[in-house]
């Protein structure tokens, strides 16, 4: 491993940027230091999380900010039996795209993520859930009391109105899930997000009503080790022979602006790409950050748009 990735010589602040930059010596606390060192966990031991702890973590998630107090999200916890169904869904209902043909179905080959799905104590599907809001909008018994408000709501573009609150609902779901995740990690639990859930047709299998859409999955459990590889795909046994290091992030100069947006510092961006190339080479992945950007940011396919519409989202 290059010296700049040797976390024994770097503070957590420096390690987050992957090099010996001037350290920020502003007083910290245990929570911030934990955030600076956080990693996705893909291996879990067989210890089960106490249901009362899950209740506490859900309360933490519900304490997150929510736009206009709408609270438009919910979560499904899957038993091990249902997780096997989800595993099969990954193979039969995957809607990922190949770059050559954006509408071609492809099968995922990520053994690390599949093993995490099997091993974790709890697997959650986080849902953008507008069903309760729809009830309030449409229930006739509420018409008399809220008649004037409902008339005002119907003014203007329906498409614009629904897109606005659907977008707010997605944002709220993400904030709640991340609050849940941070609370779990603060207690020594490991967490891994699984975005592939977003590409699966799960409506019938999990009795998901209209205007409720899976946004991502989340593996939660007790880590098998604090020092595991940060990658799930490919030759996982090969990666696990090497210690896990904190994945460096973009330098703050590229993401922090004062008063107005700064032009892109192309030189710093290329320096970061070289840093990530060195990082990935340690795990023998043979890629850089630019490769990652190009590989993972192809346009939405028609298949995903149709799936979102089936869930009742973005229909206008």
Which residue stretches match the model-derived regions?
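Acidic, surface-exposed loops and disordered segments
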Residues: 1-316
